[in-house]
């Protein structure tokens, strides 16, 4: 297969009618320079289609696919519903004797079916994909209904068959009620992990059925899977990729997704970049085509501007994708014609040379920098409801840290330093925790308390003392990390924004970096953030006062940047020296780190000083226009070299390359 960067996903109203399809093809032919692939949706509503309806759709799609291929596109089908999403137009939807997706209370979703129901797999899924193959697609995408969170029941599947299988495989005798009680008990982390593995295996079994079915028809058809952050599903992407690729024998596609349907505010796109980065990091290396989902649901023209739609593609390639899948087209009946989308596709064309540069350079290389603390078993570690809380909250807790410009890493084994919050440590194995505690870790009081309760107090250096509800000032101590602002203070107004605030109790050898006082100077806590080096050589920093919030003042920003240089043993690939709001991603290419910058401000960033890893005389700066500038060093700082960046316009991106890559 020639390298595919971008695809367009096409809804049924835009292909089922001859005139609508002709308009679609005319539009996309004009943008073949930036879109190489077309994926036709199998359905325009979210429960599974009856097989008779699917047969009609696929017979029409055979003609559409043939014509699109003749026009030079790679072309295939996006099966919207394999097990189903949620109730919609149920009079047209599939019905049958199979097990429905069911929550822990026994409530069923009539529009979705249990992925572990073998009768459903053989009597519906296999025939559906055989019909799909008859349309002669280059590829078949399996949509993101392959999950366990379905409207209106929430997380599944706890049907009688699933509980019986879990009991049999794990030598248990749970009733539904007893299983609910056991899973909701936060101390039952191992049971939760066992359930998550059970969840992942059911999905893998379904994917194997699809693989076998397609192979029996035409093993030249490439299969792809769309995902989101799949915490309640067990997040076992290596297992799913193995099932879909038949043990790595076949090339497969992947499409990480997750919300961000509007650009107001654009923060949701930045958060989605993190979600996508975590999904990419969980994929095996043999998955080489990874297209981000870019979705403007419900596909209103004003849902997202052309610029923000195109910018998403750049962000997600920076985080780990190799291209993008644009699901942005309004449906034919609701607009005069598709020409209204030319502005969006022109914006995609404008950034495509830079997108291609990033994709070709970074590919599937890992991210370098500060690890955000995500774990595939994060759902097992939630402190509240296992059935209703979301394991992704641990990673998204740290957005304020990354706004300082620290490069965000999603790869546990290649990170330079680590973040931990709350009960997240429960997700990790002992081996993983010892790796963390032997490296450099920044954590909050919740993570400290969790680690101490798990038996790691000897390695953390602190314990949690009195907790505070009233406002305090955090005063910086006379420590090298506070050079230039010792004695100054940070005020986090707890009366407005309730946050974590507590006293830290240091052990021998721990160094306070700040302490808390009232507004009259009386000390309330002798340590609020502290540093400790344990017997494994690990550098442990604990913050008990707004550890992941209110970092926008120059003193806290400077302290945090110096701190992570220390925690990482000066292995960070990049760091802004100026006090600016900036997002960065660093990709570990075979020839060195490539650093990708994003300006999330409404203002141009001017005269920004940055530190780049290594002692070097120059680096290359490449803007979105792909013009290359050679930057000369403006000094050194330890193991890093200082450079002054050219102006970086609002909501734009740039690439920094050392000369060994350039």
Language-model features, listed with the residues they occupy:
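The substrate-binding groove and active-site-proximal loops of carbohydrate-active enzymes
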Residues: 6-18, 43-58, 106-125, 187-205, ...
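Short, acidic/polar
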Residues: 14-31, 119-131, 237-244, 305-316
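Hydrophobic targeting/anchoring helices
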Residues: 31, 36, 41-42, 88, ...
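A conserved amphipathic helix/loop scaffold
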Residues: 393, 408, 412-413, 419-661
């Amino acid at each position: 297969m020639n390298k595919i960067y971008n695809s367009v996903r096409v809804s049924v109203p835009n292909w089922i009618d001859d005139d609508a399809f002709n308009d679609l093809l005319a539009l996309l032919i004009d943008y073949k320079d930036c879109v190489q692939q077309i994926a036709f949706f199998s359905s325009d509503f979210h429960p599974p289609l009856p097989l008779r309806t699917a047969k009609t759709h696929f017979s029409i799609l055979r003609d559409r696919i043939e014509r699109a291929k003749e026009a030079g596109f790679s072309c295939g089908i996006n099966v919207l519903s394999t097990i189903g999403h949620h109730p919609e137009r149920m009079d047209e939807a599939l019905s049958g004797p199979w097990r429905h997706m069911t929550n822990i209370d026994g409530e069923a979703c009539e529009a979705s079916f249990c992925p572990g129901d073998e009768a459903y797999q053989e009597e519906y899924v296999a025939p559906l994909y055989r019909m799909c193959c008859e349309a002669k697609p280059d590829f078949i995408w399996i949509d993101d209904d392959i999950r366990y969170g379905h409207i209106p029941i929430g997380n599944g599947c706890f049907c009688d068959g699933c509980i019986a299988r879990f009991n049999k495989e794990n030598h248990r005798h749970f009733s539904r009620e007893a299983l609910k009680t056991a899973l909701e008990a936060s101390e039952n982390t191992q049971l939760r992990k066992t359930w998550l593995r059970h969840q992942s295996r059911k999905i893998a079994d379904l994917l194997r059925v699809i693989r076998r079915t397609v192979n029996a028809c035409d093993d030249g058809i490439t299969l792809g899977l769309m995902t989101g952050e799949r915490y309640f599903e067990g997040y076992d992407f290596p297992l799913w990729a193995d099932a879909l690729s038949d043990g790595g024998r076949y090339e497969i596609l992947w499409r990480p997704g997750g919300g961000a349907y509007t650009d107001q505010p654009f923060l949701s796109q930045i958060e989605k970049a993190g979600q996508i980065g975590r999904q990419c990091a969980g994929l095996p290396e043999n998955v080489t085509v990874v297209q981000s989902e870019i979705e403007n649901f419900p596909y209103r023209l004003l849902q997202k501007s052309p610029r923000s739609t195109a910018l998403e593609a750049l962000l997600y390639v920076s985080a780990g994708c190799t291209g993008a899948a644009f699901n942005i087209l309004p449906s034919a009946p609701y607009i005069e014609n598709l020409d209204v989308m030319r502005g969006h596709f022109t914006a995609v064309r404008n950034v495509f040379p830079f997108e291609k540069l990033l994709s070709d350079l970074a590919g599937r290389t890992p991210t370098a920098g500060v690890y955000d603390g995500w774990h595939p078993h994060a759902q097992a570690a939630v402190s509240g409801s296992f059935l209703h809380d979301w394991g992704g909250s641990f990673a998204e807790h740290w957005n304020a840290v990354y706004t300082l410009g620290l490069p965000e890493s999603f790869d546990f084994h290649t990170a330079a330093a680590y973040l931990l919050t709350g009960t997240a440590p429960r997700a990790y194995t002992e081996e993983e925790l010892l790796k963390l505690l032997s490296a450099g870790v920044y954590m909050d009081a919740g993570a400290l308390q969790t680690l101490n309760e798990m038996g790691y107090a000897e390695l953390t250096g602190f314990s949690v003392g009195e907790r505070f509800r009233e406002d305090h000032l955090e005063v910086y101590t006379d420590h090298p990390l506070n050079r230039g602002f010792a004695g100054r203070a940070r005020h986090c107004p707890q009366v407005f924004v309730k946050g974590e605030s507590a006293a830290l109790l240091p052990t021998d050898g721990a160094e306070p970096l700040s302490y808390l006082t009232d507004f009259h100077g009386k000390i309330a806590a002798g340590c609020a953030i502290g540093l400790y080096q344990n017997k494994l050589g690990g550098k442990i920093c604990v913050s008990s006062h707004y550890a992941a919030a209110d970092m926008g003042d120059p003193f806290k920003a400077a302290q945090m940047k110096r701190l992570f240089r220390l925690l990482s043993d000066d292995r960070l690939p990049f760091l802004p020296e100026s006090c600016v709001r900036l997002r960065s991603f660093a990709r570990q290419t075979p020839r060195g780190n490539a650093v990708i910058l994003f300006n999330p401000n409404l203002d141009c960033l001017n005269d920004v000083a940055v530190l780049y890893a290594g002692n070097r005389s120059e680096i290359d700066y490449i803007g979105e226009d792909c013009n290359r500038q050679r930057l000369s060093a403006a000094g050194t700082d330890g193991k890093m070299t200082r450079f002054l960046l050219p102006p970086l316009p609002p909501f734009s991106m740039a690439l920094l390359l050392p000369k060994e890559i350039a």
